[in-house]
Amino acid sequence: MRSNPKPNPISPARIPGRRIFKVAVVTETYFPEINGVAKTLHRMVNDLVDRGHDILLFRPRQGLKDSVNDRRGYREVLMAGCRIPMYSDMRFGFPAKRILKRHFKKERPDIVHVVTEGPLGWSAVRAARDLGIPVISDFRTNFHSYTEYYKVGFAGKVVGNYLKRLHNRTAITLTPSQDLVEDLFKQGYDNVRVVSRGIDTDLFHPSKRDLSLRKEWGVNKDQLVVLYVGRIAAEKNIELSIQAFRKIQESNPNAKMVLVGEGPLKDTLENKNPDLIFCGLKKGEELAKHYASGDLFLFPSMTETFGNVVLEAMASGLGLIAYKYAAANSYLEHGVSAFLPGFGKKQEFIDMTCFLSNNAVLRKKIAAKARKKAMDCTWEKVAQSLENIYSEYSISMNYLEEQANEKINFLRIVESRSQIERAF
């Protein structure tokens, strides 16, 4: 059976006067899969359960030995699915409208929350609408942007139209950053709102810096370690971070670059760059230790909806270079708590990386301010935001009220007709 560690409760299970919701969550990726969507959703779900809500989660089966992991307030339904090409550790769910409809009829959730936009997510939208259950959706991944990195750029428009059609059939689309809200409005999305992300600042903490780990990397306490954490994949624009590091080496030949993560480009990049340190996938305390043991964090991706690693690097006390959008634009100030080159400006990214790599005092100063900002990004705020949206759109607060109003209006019409008939 899969382990499913519970984070520390963020609040009492039930707060007097606060509504408790039954939520059907539909996702094509979930713990223990390692990606930003699975990681943040797992935390959100656990926090909602700890706050007393009833969560019914639908997801594809993750291998033959996978099994449900129910507990009080949380149940799973495993669905049929298939591996995603080039991402063998991830799956998409098959269409399953009839199965979902049967479960929705039986459970009658207050709201259906669709997290991913694959065939399973689309089936959930259709099933919920057929039954008159309010459905909300998340925009968490820029799939249409990925097409440019896999030589199928022609498909970008098709994917973009598919995503817009799906989301516009839901009551509201939730996304983690304000600049993405504005971008989606420009694309024709109807109703979009920010629900941001939180970070565990006790787990990701500068105190996790480990000199023995740095020794394994072949560096002393003063040598510069440039860090990348994330998927080793084309859409992460990872080769720009390597290019920036090579520029650093021209003035600082003792610098080291450490890359944490797995992905389809890992073997290729490792063979091309034998002097770089590829650590593979790290989780929990090990991941926190790797973050805190670095000095300068590079994140050149241009396909993020948020970028959870930015918050993790901030909390870990690292100097940070990232393009000015998504999480970096939401929480960091250029020259104050990070260096933020303009979106897609490759030379700016390299120049700022070199500048900050040569200024240890400034690096520590901006890292401290980034850490302070990360302290405000609590998961409790995220849970409260979701509760507010569930209150606004759920069947218990919204749909039934509309039905009641329609009934009242109908009775008024009947009464008016009766009065007219009596008058004649």
Predicted stretch roles:
Residues 302:
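Aromatic "clamp/platform" in nucleotide-sugar-dependent glycosyltransferases that forms part
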Residues 334-335, 339-346, 355-360:
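Conserved acidic donor-binding segment of nucleotide-sugar-dependent glycosyltransferases
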Residues 319-322, 332, 339:
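Short hydrophobic beta-strand element within catalytic cores of glycosyltransferases
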Residues 266-288:
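Nucleotide-activated donor-binding/catalytic signature segment of Leloir-type glycosyltransferases, i.e.
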Residues 104, 281-282, 289-294, 386:
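Short alpha-helical donor nucleotide-sugar binding micro-motif in glycosyltransferases
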Residues 59, 77-80, 156, 160-210, ...:
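Donor nucleotide-sugar binding/catalytic pocket of nucleotide-sugar-dependent glycosyltransferases
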Residues 2-78, 380, 411-424:
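N-terminal subdomain of nucleotide-sugar transferases
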Residues 220-236, 242-246:
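Conserved donor-binding/catalytic core segment of Leloir-type glycosyltransferases
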